Amino acid sequence: GYKFDQPNVKYASLDIGSDLTADINQWGADYYKLPQNSSDYYVFFEADPRVPLLPVLPKKGQKFWYSDRGDLVDSTLTRQIDLSKVKKATLQVDLWYDIETGYDYGYVMVSRDAGKTWTTLRGKHSTTSNPSGNNLGNGYTGKSGGWITDTFDLTPYAGRKILLRFEYVTDDGYNSAGMAVDGVRIPEIGFYDDMESPNSWQANGWVLSGPYVPGRYSLIILDANSPERYVLVDAGADGRAIYKLSAQDPKDEPFLIVAAKSDNTLQKSIYRIQILPKEPGYLTLLAGRASR
C-alpha cells in the first residue's frame, strides 16, 4: 500500500467571549480549537450570504455574460450580426479575463459562411503567441487586470450577414476564472448591447449572470457529547448558524471546522465567529439555525 504523511493542520484557539472575523477561500476550510468548559456555551456563526462570482463588478448595469470555468471547456456565445447595409464596420467589446497563461485561451470570432468556418479577430490585447500549441489564432490569455475595451475591424465582412462568437477553450490541467463580456457595440449599424438580457445570443456553456452567487457554508463541530462525536451544521440562506455545546469532559477536545463551498467561484468571503456563555437573545437576532 501507499504511505502518506499525516497533514499538519494549523488551527487557532477560541475562548469563551471570543469574537473573531476572518476570510476564507471557497472550497477551503479553517480550523479552531473550542474551549473545554464545564458548562454549556454557544457557537454563533455569520458569513456573507452572497459571494462575488468574479473579482470585478459588471462594467455597466447588473449582469454580464460569463464563460464559466473548468477543465476541457469549450464554451461559445454566438449571434447573427447584419452588416449587409454598410461598407465598413467596427466592433467594440468590453472584456474581462483571467485565463491560464499560455495554455487556455479566449477568442472573439466571426463566420461568413453560417458557422462552417471561423476566423479569430485580432485585437490590441490578443496574442498569436502559441507556446503550448493550444492557441487557435488570435487569443486572449493571462489576466486583463480589470475590464478592458478592445476594437476590431469588421470591414472585411461588411455587405453581408455574419455570425459573431465569443469562445473560451481550456485544456485538462489547471484552470483560472475564465472570461466575461459586458458590452458589444457596432456603431455603424447602431448596434449596442449592454448584456442585460439574452438578446438573441445563443449560449453553449456561457451564462448570463449577476456579480454574486449564494454563499454556502458548513460547520463541523467535533463534539464528544453527540452520538457520532461530530455534528454537521449547514448555515442558512442568510449565512448564519448556531450550535450549543453542552458541558465537556475535561479529557475531550472540541473543535470547529468552517468550510466555504459557494458554487462557480473561488473568491473569498468573510465570516464571524462568537463564543458566548449563554443565549442572550441572539437566536432571534441572528435568525440562524440552532442545533441542540
Report each predicted region and the residues it spans:
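Short surface loop/edge beta-strand patches of beta-sandwich-type extracellular domains
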Residues: L77-D82
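Short coil/turn motifs at secondary-structure junctions
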Residues: D98-E100, D113, V169-D171
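Extracellular beta-strand-rich recognition modules
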Residues: A89-Y97, I162-V169, M195, V258
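Non-cytosolic beta-sheet module surface loops
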Residues: L83-K85, L95-I99, P156
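Exoplasmic/lumenal beta-rich domain surfaces
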Residues: M109-K161, V207-R240
